[in-house]
Amino acid sequence: MTRKILVTSALPYANGSIHLGHMVEHIQTDVWVRFQKLRGNECHYCCADDTHGTPVMLAAQKQGIAPEDMIAKVREEHLADFTGFFIGYDNYYSTHSPENKQFSQDIYRALKANGKIESRVIEQLFDPEKQMFLPDRFVKGECPKCHAQDQYGDNCEVCGTTYSPTELINPYSAVSGAKPELRESEHFFFKLGECADFLKAWTSGNNPHDGKPHLQAEALNKMKEWLGEGEETTLSDWDISRDAPYFGFEIPDAPGKYFYVWLDAPVGYMASFKNLCDRIGVDFDEYFKADSQTEMYHFIGKDILYFHALFWPAMLHFSGHRAPTGVYAHGFLTVDGQKMSKSRGTFITAKSYLEQGLNPEWMRYYIAAKLNSKIEDIDLNLQDFISRVNSDLVGKYVNIAARASGFIAKRFEGRLKDVADSELLAKLTAQSEAIAECYESREYARALRDIMALADIVNEYVDANKPWELAKQEGQDARLHEVCSELINAFTMLTAYLAPVLPQTAANAAKFLNLEAITWANTRETLGKHAINKYEHLMQRVEQKQVDDLIEANKQSIQTTPAPAAEESQYEKVAEQASFDDFMKIDMRVAKVLNCEAVEGSTKLLKFDLDFGFEKRIIFSGIAASYPNPAELNGRMVIAVANFAPRKMAKFGVSEGMILSAATADGKLKLLDVDAGAQPGDKVG
């Protein structure tokens, strides 16, 4: 039975270039979609640019153009990059679209009618000159601890202290330079806490299509942390509004209030699909009605699991729509074992890769060969990239056709012999369903290992039968014809197995093989007495110089592109050396979060009630921007400095320690994880 499937990748933000980190997800999705289409399923792949928010608005102002003009230009650039890597969207749209506006407003109205929307008054810093509320990173001033100038409103880049924007000395707006004021504003909240029963059932449930879980095991464990145990829930309500000026969609019946980007961004999946449906005549409602029998899968990065596994399913369900069939998260990309770095030239943009003339299918293959169904980071080792592509694709796969096609063309008028009874081909066809299951379950690394093992068998057959020697021997024409026909058939089967990963090579191979297209049926069927065309070379080797030039090109882009000093490297400068004795003065301990909550009157601080094993303490931490739902941290193990001198936090109370976190390249703060088995009070060092 033909399956009906909607598939999406997370929407790239319209305020930056596409890099290889983005490509991991879109290649993973594209491989899965192409596999489904090869199997004959009706599969629609939709994506879009995520276009709303303060960063887009300010970036457009800086360029002196309208946000609409900027996002249109960025969308063209993004689509060109993805197309260059053969990402085969059925529709690549924009969240700034009439369909998205309508769906966002309709969903909001439905949630409100179901009692899931509530208005509350909150306090925020306000720029009186620009007449806008300021996110923490748009407030600067003097660090209250080390007195460094021009520090951001959430942490000091000189001494590393975290704080609230209200603690800055002589704060000013990074947008206008004006002194900000603390003002009240009415905001709208999605009552996510009331959705806990549904979310507990959905996150732990299985999809009706094949009985597999909606979420990966690692994701489900994280959901259990966020959702709490039993009838209790740790979910906090979600602020879904922002104040004007803001580039986005205005909330119905709330002048000057706009949907927060994370409300209308996932709705962009619906909008992109609706736009496609209207063009090709597909029934949109069949896919999104509450009792839909179709399948819907979201491929995302692990950093946005909260939105896709909790917020989005709840939005859909309580607005009268279906929830996703599956949400599949992947890890991050490192290069040569380290985070991508502009200074080292390993923050590689898709555009630079294409402009340097590297074959995009090399990268598609390498990334796919590293991907599995788990939420694991993958590493692009550049030397391994060269050797694996050259060995697998050129040495094992492409050479099979090159070694047999010439004899078929010259000696047998380009026509194959019927080799349906070949033992060699039987070994290849026997793996069809096993490899299909690997693709279906996103075990691409295993699929490609198995495919290359089959290629090894074929190459062993080449070496054992030596067609170049048969061609020189009298009376061996029939055997030569048989061997070369087996090899061309084997090449066809391998091409079908690799087609989801190498779509352009498969298309070029189809021309050589005189086939309309490669399908999954080619993994099980021989070609018979089929005429083929002249062989054209299908793939070149990767040269070391090409990779070296790529790295240099990305280093050069930093030197020639004006940017703030903070953008020169994604890593902060290493502090002065500390002696061993200095380090030993710091007493770091594991602590369990008993309760975490927002601090009334602060947009920056979270209050942690911690169990250190030997005693309980309260610590304030300036990480509210990174954890908008603080209750999700309840029950988590953290690392804290236990002998840090108590510090009075303005009017909020005394902080009895410091919780350790990592500052990411985009300014977010992430708590450090503790391995399973560690207990409160355990010493870290």
UniProtKB/Swiss-Prot annotation:
Domain tRNA-binding: 582-685
Amino-acid positions noted as binding ATP in the UniProt annotation, renumbered to this chain: 342
GO molecular function, one term: methionine-tRNA ligase activity
Binding site for Zn(2+): 143, 146, 156, 159
UniProt-listed GO biological process terms: methionyl-tRNA aminoacylation
GO cellular component terms given for this protein: cytosol
Keywords: Aminoacyl-tRNA synthetase, ATP-binding, Cytoplasm, Ligase, Metal-binding, Nucleotide-binding, Protein biosynthesis, RNA-binding, tRNA-binding, Zinc
Motif annotated as 'HIGH' region, chain positions: 12-22
Family matches, as Gene3D superfamilies: HUPs, Isoleucyl-tRNA Synthetase, Domain 1, Methionyl-tRNA synthetase, Zn-domain, Nucleic acid-binding proteins
Localization per Swiss-Prot or TrEMBL: Cytoplasm
Enzyme class: ligase
Cofactor(s) of this protein: Zn(2+)
SS bond partners: none
Catalytic activities: tRNA(Met) + L-methionine + ATP = L-methionyl-tRNA(Met) + AMP + diphosphate
Record function comment: Is required not only for elongation of protein synthesis but also for the initiation of all mRNA translation through initiator tRNA(fMet) aminoacylation.
Subunit note: Homodimer.
HAMAP family, per the entry: Met_tRNA_synth_type1 (MF_00098)
Family: Belongs to the class-I aminoacyl-tRNA synthetase family. MetG type 1 subfamily.
Protein name: Methionine--tRNA ligase
Organism expressing this protein natively: Neisseria meningitidis serogroup A / serotype 4A (strain DSM 15465 / Z2491)
